[in-house]
Each structure stands twice: as structure tokens, then as C-alpha cells.
Amino acid sequence: MTAAIIDYGSGNLHSAAKALECAARGMEGLQRIVVTRDPDVVFRADRVVLPGVGAFADCRRGLDALDGMVQALTEVVRDKARPFLGICVGMQLMATRGKEHVTTDGLGWIAGDVERISPRDESLKIPHMGWNTLDPAREHPVLEGLPLGPKGRHAYFVHSYHLNAANETDVLARADYGGPVTAIVGKDTAIGTQFHPEKSQRFGLALIANFLRWKP
């Protein structure tokens, strides 16, 4: 089994690769983890990871700049139904559109817009940076066994925008930052986290391990 991490000029590639390698250690059947800019490698991969850091429009532009990459992603995830993990802006790109400074089309896998978070408590700063527990919205194999809820482990967030999903069933978990913030979305064989699992210590590694074992 091969897991491909897409390098499109945005994302903590080294951290993501190291986290996947650590989570996969001793896992039967996982042959290799590759960082790639080649859509053919993505097309042949058994699982795909799309990290992302920065502005939505910049990340979409970087993805579009890799000739054939969006098509490969669409075929692998939507047509071939292989597992996909989007991280931070990689998760936001799953949405219908992003509204960060300008309106930009997303991949359209999760109905909804990426909008600026607006905490009810004006003392809470944006960007939201720090550790939060997650409140589960529905069950999912990638969340199995993870310590969620107010007494669960914390995940690490750095963001100013989140995916406001149109369908409640696409939201797997939320965080509280002066109001609900979408933390995890999932639909069919695609899942996305607004937080950084590669920076979320044992909790993040457990989620990544579940993703690598997931057989939708």
C-alpha cells in the first residue's frame, strides 16, 4: 500500500510525512509513504493526503498549477473511492468554495463555504491558535477509539476560517472557540481535519493510524 502526500507548495510536508511514517510503524501492508508533485503517482496511490497552510485562494492556485493534479484527485477520490485525508486548508479545499478575501471555488466534495470564524467572546483572538478538545457529531471509523469530548485529548489548531458545511451529516466533530468550529468533516471515502494531526501528538498519530487502516 502506498500513501501519497501532495506537494503543491503549501503545507507542512516534512511534518506530515514524519507523522504518517510514525503512525504506520509496524503496520502490516503499508509499503511506502511518498511526497509527490506527480499526478500519476497520486493516481496510482492507495491513499492520498492533502496538507495545506495559508490562504484558500493561494492553495487552490498552487494545486491548479500542477498540471493534471485536480483531475487525478477527482478520479482517485470520487471515481475510484480511495481514502483521502485533507489537513487544515487541505480540508477546506474539499468545500464548495472559499470566502477568504475573495471567493474561490473548492473541489466541491463537501457542500458548504469556508468562512471566517466569529467567536461570540470578543476577547478571543483570531487566528485561533492553540489546543482544543473535540466534540463528536457522529461516528466514523477514523474516529474509532479516539478520546473525544470535554475530557478527551486536545488537537492543535491554527486558523482563521472554517468549513461551514451545508449538511449536518458531513460534520464528524466540532471544537468550541466562542462558538462551534468545524473540526472534522467526512463524506464517502474523504475525511478532513481543520486541526493539524501531525502536530497533535498522540491524539493526532492515533487519528492518522486509523486513517491508514481505514477500509471504506
From Swiss-Prot:
Which organism's genome codes for this protein? Nitrobacter winogradskyi (strain ATCC 25391 / DSM 10237 / CIP 104748 / NCIMB 11846 / Nb-255)
Determine if Amino-acid biosynthesis is one of this entry's keywords. yes
Which residue ranges does UniProt annotate as crossing the membrane?
Answer: none
Protein's cellular compartments: Cytoplasm
Task: Report the protein's function.
Answer: IGPS catalyzes the conversion of PRFAR and glutamine to IGP, AICAR and glutamate. The HisH subunit provides the glutamine amidotransferase activity that produces the ammonia necessary to HisF for the synthesis of IGP and AICAR.
Keyword annotations: Amino-acid biosynthesis, Cytoplasm, Glutamine amidotransferase, Histidine biosynthesis, Hydrolase, Lyase
Gene this chain is encoded by: hisH1
Which GO biological process annotations does it have? L-histidine biosynthetic process
Active site at which residues? 88, 196, 198
Start and end residues of each Glutamine amidotransferase type-1 domain: 2-216
GO MF term (any one): glutaminase activity
Q: Which HAMAP family match?
A: HisH
Q: Please describe the quaternary structure of this protein.
A: Heterodimer of HisH and HisF.
Does the record's keyword annotation contain Metal-binding? no
> Which pathway does it operate in?
Amino-acid biosynthesis; L-histidine biosynthesis; L-histidine from 5-phospho-alpha-D-ribose 1-diphosphate: step 5/9
Catalytic activity, as annotated: 5-[(5-phospho-1-deoxy-D-ribulos-1-ylimino)methylamino]-1-(5-phospho-beta-D-ribosyl)imidazole-4-carboxamide + L-glutamine = D-erythro-1-(imidazol-4-yl)glycerol 3-phosphate + 5-amino-1-(5-phospho-beta-D-ribosyl)imidazole-4-carboxamide + L-glutamate + H(+); L-glutamine + H2O = L-glutamate + NH4(+)
EC numbers: 4.3.2.10, 3.5.1.2
Q: Please name the Pfam families in this protein's record.
A: GATase (PF00117)
Q: What is this protein called?
A: Imidazole glycerol phosphate synthase subunit HisH 1
In terms of InterPro entries, this protein maps to: Class_I_gatase-like (IPR029062), GATASE (IPR017926), Imidazole-glycPsynth_HisH (IPR010139)
Identify one Gene Ontology CC term for this UniProt entry. cytoplasm
Q: Which domain of life is it from?
A: Bacteria
Coarsely, its chief localization is cytoplasm
